């Protein structure tokens, strides 16, 4: 049986997106998706970067090995792209502390699939109602298709990944980025760190350990000027 699904994801590095693991592995089917694609910054009128096949998907083994209920706290995944498309779109940061987030205002941006043929991005923000260390609960408006959307704070740092909705009680939930899953995230980022020159949509960028360089940079005994976005302005 061929089944096609949809979800949301956000860039946390120029070549890495974070999403929900259940967008890739489904317990009800007992298997991973054959293929997964991203359509960065898609809108109803255009696909700016086209349909890009994901190079690799990384997720915690507990999500697959546990039953669907117990696996919920491990429901996040990282999507690795061949090219750093995020350089053209911007990225979200990761949390710098593990404080309780009850009461803070968070934002969710994603693509609901109320109409499977329409790709329209929506954003909403509300306060976190509770934080038990594993899940964040809130009443941000979401629909099917939002799964995998990041929950981010006022500093544009990801604090959770939206995974659950309870329509009856109008409560939605996210897996919190915590001391259990952050080491996994950082290990994946290290393993897929960008290095050297990358050409993106006709512009050149230079990376060191995943970070775009800016300003004047001496590279292989030659000086180059990279603007605030990382784009090279000098010639070869």
Residue spans of the language-model regions?
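Catalytic histidine site
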Residues: 1-37, 127-129, 174
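Short, small/polar residue-rich loop motifs at catalytic or cofactor-binding pockets
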Residues: 3-6, 143-147, 219
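Conserved catalytic-core segment of clan PA serine endopeptidases
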Residues: 4, 25, 29-86
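Short beta->alpha transition motifs characteristic of CBS
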Residues: 20-23, 144, 160-168
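Chymotrypsin/trypsin-fold serine protease catalytic domain
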Residues: 72-142, 172-173, 181-186
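Extracellular adhesion/carbohydrate-binding repeat motifs centered on closely spaced tryptophans
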Residues: 192-236
